[in-house]
């Protein structure tokens, strides 16, 4: 089991619980498949221990002999807790019946107006820009359950949906400015703020530009107007991820003055994906600063990411035990301020130089210890 598998397990467990809590046909959970059963084993079992405000839950799912089984009683208990705590409750409809003895009042699930935490899983294939143009407008008011819909568990970012949502909020803001010139749409304002904060210095505006033929996402970078497709892959992937997450937070927090301060759990597999080393170094601090109350669980192989996290972040290294072949999780010391070479050598068991260069350096040290300076100089010249 590797780091990606751990994120997959979290997603399999959370998605089933949230699907049951929401009772929404558009929120779907994945099932354990045969590929999830280790070769040579008869079953795969995954378990979640959950604690919230003193309430403890223990839920498991497993795959055995081609069947999917789970702890249904515990699923009901934890999903009912989440439903009543954050979503709403089932209420009886108030109807008049001709015969009260034979008619049973119907119950309907009714959402409350409280904020809800978000949960999103972003996989390695999360960003796929199929088109840069918008041809279908966002329609309809979004209920807070929309924060849990639209591939929240699927690992991918619905980029087109984000564009449509952004355009819809921008058009709404423009309409209210007819009567109130300086009015702002809180949801749009929060998303813009999140994206610009994450992109950092040099970016001053983001909006949808509409012409007679199409509509495009436009950013202002160093006073230059650029279409989305003109940005680097790193900039586009940051906009896609931050835009999707901030959109969900804006929908999930109708009563919060700053939706970016909403709560939630976000899983990101290979956070350094498609990012230049400069972006690898700044992406995690940018996410932390933009979304201060989100618990991020991320995987990475990038030393630049590891050296950027502070002492408040728990770094865990996965490695296989030589005797039991079990995958062990080992807490690591904070690596903020460490140089990349040290992280590669001490934590990733990787040589800084290639094998040929390493052998030359070792031989140079041998010659120096033997005071064979002429021979050492010849090898140094080979490295020059």
Language model segments and positions:
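Amphipathic alpha-helical segments that form well-ordered structural scaffolds
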Residues: 9, 45, 121, 190-198, ...
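A structural signal for short, well-ordered beta-strand segments and their strand-loop junctions
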Residues: 120-123, 205-210, 218, 298, ...
